[in-house]
């Protein structure tokens, strides 16, 4: 039996999808899996999520592929799934399986030669989420928080190539790289 799996096209999403495939194949060797890579609306913009529609931007095209029978299942990072799985009028989908939880912590990546204790008032630290922003400002209210979007590779490249001192990312993302 062939299972078509809708996934975002980013390397991290593909890694997660391959984890799902390994789990499926461990249950029954008779399954063949095909990854259907989809560019989500959330991947196509650099604007902050709160300005453009929130987390649903990452899942809507994947769910459309399910409703059009172009895919049999979709793999999402749970942080990208809105609390309502489908807008009114769409097919309703269910979460039927989850991989074991990865490391839940955040990490700070710093420019080469910068140590955490070197961060001072005005240090520019990039992050994408309001929780991380609040935590950084609790450490030092004079940090300059820079909004950042993009997949993990894009964010790391921005840290290296732009005027940033640090970047906050999920440890799980770093583990999967």
Where do the model's predicted regions map?
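Domain-level signature for soluble enzymes in the chorismate/prephenate branch of the shikimate pathway
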Residues: 1-177
């Amino acid at each position: 039996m062939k299972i078509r799996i809708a996934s975002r096209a980013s390397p991290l999403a593909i890694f997660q999808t391959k984890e799902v495939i390994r789990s499926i194949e461990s249950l029954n060797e008779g399954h063949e899996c095909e990854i259907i890579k989809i560019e989500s609306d959330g991947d196509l913009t650099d604007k902050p999520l709160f300005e453009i529609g929130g987390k649903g931007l990452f899942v809507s095209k994947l769910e459309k592929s399910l409703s059009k029978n172009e895919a049999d299942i979709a793999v999402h990072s749970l942080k990208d799934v809105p609390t309502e799985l489908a807008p009114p009028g769409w097919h309703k989908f269910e979460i039927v399986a989850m991989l074991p939880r990865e490391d839940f912590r955040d990490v700070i990546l710093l420019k080469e030669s910068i140590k955490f204790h070197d961060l001072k008032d005005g240090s520019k630290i990039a992050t994408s989420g309001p929780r991380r922003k609040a935590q950084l400002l609790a450490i030092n209210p004079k940090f300059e928080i820079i909004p950042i979007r993009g997949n993990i590779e894009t964010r790391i490249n921005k840290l290296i190539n732009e005027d940033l001192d640090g970047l906050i990312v999920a440890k799980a993302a770093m583990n999967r790289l």
